[in-house]
Amino acid sequence: MDDYKDTLNLPKTLFSMRGNLSKKEPNILKSWNENNLYKLIRKKNQEKKIFFLHDGPPYANGNIHIGHAVNKILKDIIIKSKNMSGFDAPYIPSWDCHGLPIEQKVEEKIKSNQGEISTTEFQEKCRKYAQDQVEKQKKDFIRLGVIGDWDNPHLTMNFKNEANIIKTLSKIVQKKHLYQDFKPIHWCLKCASSLSEAEIEYSKKKSDSIIVGFKFKYRSIIEKLFDFQISNKKEIHLLIWTTTPWTLPSSKAISIHPDFQYQLIETERCYLIIAKELVEKTLNTLKIKKSIIRNYVKGRFLEKMICLHPFLKNIDLPVILGKHVTLESGTGAVHTAPDHGLEDYIISQKYNIKTSNIVNFKGEYISNTHDKLDGVNVLEANSIIIELLIKNNTFFHHESLIHSYPHCWRHKSPVIYRATPQWFIDIDQKQLRIKLLQEIKKVRWIPEWGESRIGEMIKKRPDWCISRQRKWGVPMSIFIHKNTRKIHPNTFVFMKKIAKKVELEGLQVWWNIDSKEILGEEYQSYEKILDILDVWFESGNTHTTINYKNKNYTKKNADMFLEGSDQHRGWFMSSLIISTLISEKKPYSEVLTHGFVVDGKGQKMSKSIGNTISPNEIVDTLGADILRLWVASSNYSNDISISNEILKSSSDIYRRIRNTARFMLANISDFDPKKNIISKENMVLLDKWAIGQTKIVQEEIIQHYNNYNFHAVIQRLMYFCSIEMGSFYLDIIKDRQYTLKKHSQERRSSQTAIYYIINSLVRWIAPILSFTADEIWSYLPENNSQYVFMEEWFDKLFYLDQDDLFNYQFWNEIITIKHEINKFLEEAIQNKTINNSLETSIILYVSHELSNKLKILEQETKFIFLTSDIQIKLYDTAPKNAKKSKIVPYLKVSLEKIKGKKCPRCWHYFNFTKKNIKNSDICNRCILNTIGNGEKRIFI
C-alpha cells in the first residue's frame, strides 16, 4: 500500500494546542509595553466618539484581592469592546491615596520616634507609602491584561487633584451648603475619628438587651394624672428597653409617643407604665403573672413629668414627646441620650436639652461620670451599668440579643454614635435631596434595582459629615471666627488662593501656611481649621477632573461608573451629591454594579475561614486569561462564586475556544488573502452559510457586549465553537480541506470562509481572552494593524440571501437532521454494528419537499453526514425497522454497513469491482484529486 500522506493538505501551525498562559502572557505584556499599545490605540481612535468609563479609585493599600480583579477585568472588557465598536474608549486608572489606613501603616513604621516627627514630615511619609502601594497594585493590574494609561494614573494625592478638591469645597461653601454642628455621628473607637455613611457596614452583633425603670419623682402628680390613689408605698416606674446600656449615663430624657395610650399597671413589686399595645409582651418578658391595670392616659399628658436617673444621683430627666417612638418592640418609651443617637439629638433640640459630652475620642467615660465608670471603655461598661441598676432597684430584665449593628468598614469593629463638633453638607438646603432623586431617574442602572436602592438611601440619609480629625488628607482649608464660630465671609476667595498654593506644593501647605498671609490683619480673630476631608469627598470629586485629563471630552458627565454593589452608599452617592451640588447634573450616564466574590459554597471570602483565593496565584498557575474568562462567564449582577472546580470549568471552556482557533489557523497555513480569496459568487454553498452564520453570531455577540452580558457572550461563543463550527461546519469541510487539490477553488473557498471566521472570532474574544487573542492575531496572515485591539469588528462578513433555496431555513433543517443521524450513528457504534460513520451506508426517508432539495445536492449529500454512501427515499417507502426521528417530522433512517474497499487516502469506502487507473488502490475521487483535474464541489 502506498503512503498518500504527501498528497494530502494536512493542517499545519505553530499555534500550540496548550495555552501555557502563565509562561506566554508575560512576553505578550512586554510587547504591549515596549510598543506602547495604549498610545497606539488612542492614536488610531483619536477622531472617534469618546466613551469614558470613569475608574472608581481603589484604596492604595495592600495587595489586590479577587474582588479587585473582578472589577478591573469587567472594566477592561467593556473598554476593549467599546474600542471594537468604533469608540475611542480611554482608560485612566485611579487610586484613593489619602485616609486612615495609610496613616496607621505609617504610624506602625515610626512608632519609636512618632513624637519627634512633624505633621508635614508625617504627611510626606504617607505620600511615599501610598506611592509605593500604587506601584505595587499597578503591576498586578497590568498583569491581568488591563490596558490603560498606567504612566499617567489619576491619584487623589497629585497636587493638582488635591487643589481641585479644595476648589470643589469652596463652591459648596459659596452655595452655603456647608455648616458646622455639634451632633452625634458614627465614631470608630479604633480610627478615633468620625465616619461617613459610606464607611459603615452592618454586621451581626451580640448585644445586651435590658429593661430599665425610671422612677417618677413626684408620685402625687402621677396619681392625679391617672386618677388613681396609691395607698401603698410602691414606686412608679416608666419602663424603657435598650440594647445600648452604656448610653444610660448620657441619658437626658425619656421619649414617649404623644398619641399612644400608656397604662398604669400594679404588680407585686411596683407600678409600671407601659404602652397599651406592648403591655402583654412586656409582662411576659418580665415573667409577671399577677398584675392589675389601674388606668391609662394618652402620652401627651405625661409630657414634662420628671423621672429620676436610674443610677446617677441628683439628676432629673423630663418626659418628652417624639413621634420616632414606635410599637414595634420595647415598652413604648425610650431613654434619650442626645450624644449617642441622631433621633435623640433631634428631639432633644426641640426641648433645648444639651448633650453631656462624657465620652472621649477613645470611647472612654471622662472623669466625674461615676466612680465605677470613669476611664472605662463604653463597649466594656454594660456589666458595670447592670450592677448599678440592680443596686438602685431599677433593673428589670436582661437577655442577649443578636441583631444588625453598624461596624467600621476598615476595622470590622462596632462603632458608636458620639456627639462632636463636625462639618456637614446640608442635604436638604435648596431642595438638594429632591434634585438628587430627580437626577438618578436620568441614569441607566444595571441591574435596574440599583435605582431604587440608591433612591431609598437618598431619602433616608442624614446630612453628610465630611470632616475628619486626622492628618493625611486634603485640608478643609477654612478659617472660623474664634468667638462666633462662623466661617470667614471671604472664604471662597481664600480657598482659591490656598488651592493655587496646594497645586504647587501639595496639601502640606495648609499646615505650614501663616494665617496672616491669607487673612491679613484679621488673622488674630480667626482660627485655622485643621480637620481634613472625608476620603469619600475626595473620591466623589474625581469626576470633576475628567475634562482636565481628556481635553477632547466635552460631556458634562462620564458615560459609566462600574463598581461593587456596596458603592451605592459610597462612591456613587458621594459623586452624585457633589456633581448635583456643583453642576446640578448627574456625574454618570450609566451605573453598573457587580456582586461580591464568594467561595464555591456561597460563603463570603475570609482569611479567618481560609477560603480566599489570590488572583496572583491564579495568574501564576493558570494564566490571566483563565481568570478573565471566569469573570466573563459569571453572572456578575449577583455574588460571584469561585473555586478550583469552577476555574477548571473555565479552563475547559478555554480549551474548546483555543482548539477551534487552532484548527482554523492550521487550515489556512498556506492561504494568502491577497491571492487566494474567493468571491462570494464563486464560493461553495456551505461556505457561504458558514460566513452568513458567523455574521448572525457576530451581531448577537456585539449586542451582548453592548448590554454588558458577558456571560451570554461566552455561552454564544461556546455554542458557535462546539456545535455550529465543531460538530458541523469544520467537521464537514475536513474532507474538502485535506483531499482536494491544494489550489482548487473549492478548497480556497473553505479557506476563505475560515479566514473570515477566525478574523471574526479573534475580535470576539479579544475583550475577554486578551492574551490569547493577541497570540492568534500574530499567526493570522495579512493583519491590518499591529494589534487586534486596534481593530473594529470584522466587516467582510455577509448574510445569505433569504430568497435562495439554500437559505438559513434550509441549513437549519440540515443541521437538525445531521444531529439526529449522529444519534443513530452513535447508537450503532456503541452496539458495535459499525466502527465509524464512513463505513456506513445511510438511507434517509423524507418528505417530497426535502427529498427534492437533497437530490439537488446529488452525491455531495454524503459529505454532510460524513458517510461513504447515502440514498434519499420518500418517507412512505420506509421499512418497518427504519428508525423514526422524535424531533424531525417525516424522517426515518436506516443504517447499513457499506460494502466495498476503504480508500487509504480519503478513508471513504468505494466499489472496487472496476479496475482503477494504473491498478491504484485509491478511489476514483482521490485519483481525480491527485493526478486528475480535481474534484468539483458546488454545495458541500
From Swiss-Prot:
It catalyses: tRNA(Ile) + L-isoleucine + ATP = L-isoleucyl-tRNA(Ile) + AMP + diphosphate. The keyword Transmembrane does not apply. The keyword Nucleotide-binding applies. L-isoleucyl-5'-AMP binds at residue 563. A motif ('KMSKS' region) lies at residues 604-608. CDD domains: Anticodon_Ia_Ile_BEm, IleRS_core. Binds 1 zinc ion per subunit. ATP binds at residue 607. Gene3D superfamilies: 1.10.730.20, HUPs (3.40.50.620). Keywords: Aminoacyl-tRNA synthetase, ATP-binding, Cytoplasm, Ligase, Metal-binding, Nucleotide-binding, Protein biosynthesis, Zinc. InterPro entries: aa-tRNA-synth_I_CS, aa-tRNA-synth_Ia, Anticodon_Ile_BEm, Ile-tRNA-ligase, Ile-tRNA-ligase_type1, Ile-tRNA_ligase, M/V/L/I-tRNA-synth_anticd-bd, Rossmann-like_a/b/a_fold. GO terms for molecular function: aminoacyl-tRNA deacylase activity; ATP binding; isoleucine-tRNA ligase activity; tRNA binding; zinc ion binding. Zn(2+) binds at residues 903, 906, 923, 926. One of its GO terms (cellular component) is cytosol. A motif ('HIGH' region) lies at residues 58-68. Its EC number is 6.1.1.5. IleRS has two distinct active sites: one for aminoacylation and one for editing. The misactivated valine is translocated from the active site to the editing site, which sterically excludes the correctly activated isoleucine. The single editing site contains two valyl binding pockets, one specific for each substrate (Val-AMP or Val-tRNA(Ile)). Belongs to the class-I aminoacyl-tRNA synthetase family. IleS type 1 subfamily. Monomer. Catalyzes the attachment of isoleucine to tRNA(Ile). As IleRS can inadvertently accommodate and process structurally similar amino acids such as valine, to avoid such errors it has two additional distinct tRNA(Ile)-dependent editing activities. One activity is designated as 'pretransfer' editing and involves the hydrolysis of activated Val-AMP. The other activity is designated 'posttransfer' editing and involves deacylation of mischarged Val-tRNA(Ile). This is Isoleucine--tRNA ligase.
